[in-house]
Amino acid sequence: MTDKTSLSYKDAGVDIDAGNALVGRIKGVVKKTRRPEVMGGLGGFGALCALPQKYREPVLVSGTDGVGTKLRLAMDLKRHDTIGIDLVAMCVNDLVVQGAEPLFFLDYYATGKLDVDTASAVISGIAEGCLQSGCSLVGGETAEMPGMYHGEDYDVAGFCVGVVEKSEIIDGSKVSDGDVLIALGSSGPHSNGYSLVRKILEVSGCDPQTTELDGKPLADHLLAPTRIYVKSVLKLIEKVDVHAIAHLTGGGFWENIPRVLPDNTQAVIDESSWQWPEVFNWLQTAGNVERHEMYRTFNCGVGMIIALPAPEVDKALALLNANGENAWKIGIIKASDSEQRVVIE
């Protein structure tokens, strides 16, 4: 018999030692996110979490999301520290619009070759997002898959579970004629529209690291982490009769606002109530993007829109602004049988 070389998993491109090193690196930041309801620690086959005792009829709310091609821009610019915040934000913001308090979060990180420093930066960002939203990072999957991704490219996905009192679910059914719409300012494009962002960068020939906008590199505007609205919105829900909340993500104004409107209602948005942050003006000009397309692709400075009764507006604005939000009245709800569910005028 001829001698054969003994192959290992590492020879095939999977470094178990690197995976173990990553777990050791992130344990500290993950521990900081722990809620009292979580049982056990990292390393189990599954994560255990009790329901908070304050709920009489708890309803679980779940969501999953990614960060789209904002990830490609982050990889190109070698900036991995905030993409994890984006990942958490996209999930927990979708939960809180239904009145849910996020409980726990899990992540999926896949790459062709595991770079411990990069993965650690991403997961540290995820932990920071969990801290900002008050949920526990209870586990995840790090998949090193040679041949599936180019070099050290990676992809991430997030999964979140929250809880809401059954009688306090926010589903838009209470929205009615005369309700007022309040906007919550965004931190930038958040995590949507980045295929168009990257196309605009390509066509314009712009280097986002050297192009200045409002006194800082364009890259800082484009990679600003998605704002997490959980804590301020939960405080609002405790004090104010909120009828509906829309998270402005993919599809922008035209597609997200109708998701929370009952039949025979229309949202009328007052375009003069705010000014677009400069990054959106730059994108529109550099890409020669039509106004309708801007509102379909980007949040244009508005991360969430909240519908509530007119008598609650002043109280809501004061509470939101006191909790660090940039909130303003952006429009109203009108009774209408028009097929156009959103009007911007």
UniProtKB/Swiss-Prot annotation:
Domain of life: Bacteria
Pfam family, one: AIRS
Disulfide pattern: none
Any GO CC annotation of this UniProt entry: cytosol
Reactions catalysed: 2-formamido-N(1)-(5-O-phospho-beta-D-ribosyl)acetamidine + ATP = 5-amino-1-(5-phospho-beta-D-ribosyl)imidazole + ADP + phosphate + H(+)
Assigned EC number: 6.3.3.1
Alphabetical UniProt keywords: ATP-binding, Cytoplasm, Ligase, Nucleotide-binding, Purine biosynthesis
GO biological process, alphabetically ordered: 'de novo' IMP biosynthetic process; adenine biosynthetic process
Main location: cytoplasm
GO MF annotation list: ATP binding; phosphoribosylamine-glycine ligase activity; phosphoribosylformylglycinamidine cyclo-ligase activity
InterPro entries found in the cross-reference section: PurM-like_C_dom (IPR010918), PurM-like_C_sf (IPR036676), PurM-like_N (IPR016188), PurM-like_N_sf (IPR036921), PurM_cligase (IPR004733)
Broad EC category: ligase
Gene3D superfamilies: PurM-like C-terminal domain, PurM-like, N-terminal domain
Compartments in which it is found: Cytoplasm
Biological or metabolic pathway of the protein: Purine metabolism; IMP biosynthesis via de novo pathway; 5-amino-1-(5-phospho-D-ribosyl)imidazole from N(2)-formyl-N(1)-(5-phospho-D-ribosyl)glycinamide: step 2/2
Family indicated by similarity: Belongs to the AIR synthase family.
Name of this protein: Phosphoribosylformylglycinamidine cyclo-ligase
